[in-house]
Amino acid sequence: MQSLEQCVNSLEAIVHQLDGSVSRLARNGEASNELCEGILKIKRVFELVPEYDVESARLALFEEVDPMVKTLGDKIEKALIRKRRELENLRQTSELNSLRLSGDLYFSETGIDNQDMDVSTDAIAIASATDAELDELRALKARRAELQELLDGR
């Protein structure tokens, strides 16, 4: 309340000072009296607003903005979920491609024709696999590589 009183006092002081400036200009510039009256008129463009009106306007603004913010937050959350799913699918695709590449390397090194193997369902199986299944697949792949090294070493 004290700052409001300070604002009112400051505005009154400004109005008083402007009144004095206009009256001095009117006295000193009798020839340009029309200019002083037309351009230098004092216009009061401020008024005091009750605190109740300020609070009700603030509440109305919150009521208008809050639903928009919540809607935007929901949209962002859904987009994040979609992007996480897309990232997981890309990781699984990358894993599948690396498995295929390592399989192609194995077949090229051993000279075995990999055309006989049907891997057409591998993409579906790995794309729909869970993390635990992918971990098990990695472990089996590592075990297969170890066994192959043992066979190659003999």
UniProtKB/Swiss-Prot annotation:
Its localization reads: Nucleus; Cytoplasm, Cytoskeleton, Spindle; Chromosome, Centromere, Kinetochore
* A GO molecular-function descriptor: microtubule plus-end binding
Q: Which residues form a coiled coil?
A: 72-96, 127-154
Name the Pfam families on file.
DASH_Spc19
- What is any one GO biological process for this UniProt entry? positive regulation of microtubule polymerization
Superkingdom as given in the UniProt entry: Eukaryota
> Which protein are we looking at?
DASH complex subunit SPC19
Q: Does the keyword Coiled coil apply?
A: yes
Task: Explain the purpose of this protein.
Answer: Component of the DASH complex that connects microtubules with kinetochores and couples microtubule depolymerisation to chromosome movement; it is involved in retrieving kinetochores to the spindle poles before their re-orientation on the spindle in early mitosis and allows microtubule depolymerization to pull chromosomes apart and resist detachment during anaphase.
Q: Which InterPro entries match?
A: DASH_Spc19 (IPR013251)
Family assignment from sequence similarity: Belongs to the DASH complex SPC19 family.
Keyword set, alphabetical order? Cell cycle, Cell division, Centromere, Chromosome, Chromosome partition, Coiled coil, Cytoplasm, Cytoskeleton, Kinetochore, Microtubule, Mitosis, Nucleus
Could you describe the subunit structure of this protein?
A: Component of the DASH complex consisting of ASK1, DAD1, DAD2, DAD3, DAD4, DAM1, DUO1, HSK3, SPC19 and SPC34, with a stoichiometry of one copy of each subunit per complex. Multiple DASH complexes oligomerize to form a ring that encircles spindle microtubules and organizes the rod-like NDC80 complexes of the outer kinetochore. DASH complex oligomerization strengthens microtubule attachments. On cytoplasmic microtubules, DASH complexes appear to form patches instead of rings.
Under the cellular component aspect of Gene Ontology, which terms does the record hold? cytoplasm; DASH complex; spindle microtubule
